[in-house]
C-alpha cells in the first residue's frame, strides 16, 4: 500500500461509519468515487502493475464479502465499501484487513448482543445460519434475513473501519 492511500481511506471510513451508524446505509455517492479514485491513483503511481494490484484488492474485498452479502449476511453497501478499500490497499493488505474486520465484527456483535440482552438468540441464530444452509439453499433463516424488518441489524462499517485501520499498523 502506498502512503497516499492512508488519508483518503481514513476519511471515507469515518464518513461510512457515521452514515452506517446513523441510517444503516453506506451511500454509493461515497463508495463508488472512492473505488474509481483508488484504481486511478494506483495506475498513476505504478502503471499497469498498479492497475492489477488495485483490481486484485477490489476483487479480494468484493468477492469475499460479496459471498456473505449474497447469502444475506451483510448489506451490499458493506461489500462495496470493502471492494473500494481493496482498490486502494491491494489484495495482500485487503486480506489482512478482512481477517481483522471479521475479528472486530465478532467482538462487536458479542458486545451488542450482551448489551441488548439477546445473546441466547444470537447463538441460536448463528447455529441456524451455519447448520441450516444446506436445507435452505444457502439463504439465511427468515428470522435473520436482512430484508425482514424484525431482524436485528448491526451496522458493520465500524468493524470494517477498525479492521482496515489495524491492518495499516500490522505492516
Model regions: which residues?
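A membrane-topology feature that recognizes alpha-helical transmembrane segments
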Residues: 1-171
Amino acid at each position: 500500500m502506498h502512503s497516499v492511500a492512508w488519508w483518503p481511506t481514513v476519511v471515507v471510513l469515518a464518513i461510512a461509519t457515521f452514515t452506517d451508524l446513523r441510517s444503516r446505509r453506506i451511500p454509493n455517492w461515497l463508495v463508488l468515487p472512492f473505488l474509481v479514485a483508488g484504481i486511478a491513483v494506483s495506475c498513476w503511481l505504478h502503471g499497469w502493475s498498479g492497475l492489477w494490484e488495485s483490481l486484485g484488492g477490489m476483487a479480494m474485498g468484493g468477492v469475499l464479502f460479496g459471498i456473505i452479502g449474497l447469502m444475506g449476511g451483510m448489506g451490499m453497501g458493506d461489500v462495496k465499501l470493502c471492494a473500494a478499500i481493496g482498490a486502494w490497499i491491494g489484495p495482500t493488505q485487503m486480506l489482512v484487513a478482512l481477517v481483522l474486520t471479521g475479528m472486530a465484527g465478532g467482538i462487536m456483535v458479542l458486545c451488542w448482543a450482551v448489551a441488548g440482552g439477546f445473546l441466547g438468540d444470537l447463538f441460536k441464530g448463528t447455529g441456524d445460519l451455519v447448520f441450516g444452509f444446506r436445507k435452505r439453499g444457502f439463504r439465511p433463516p427468515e428470522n435473520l434475513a436482512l430484508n425482514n424488518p424484525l431482524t436485528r441489524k448491526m451496522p458493520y462499517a465500524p468493524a470494517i473501519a477498525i479492521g482496515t485501520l489495524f491492518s495499516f499498523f500490522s505492516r
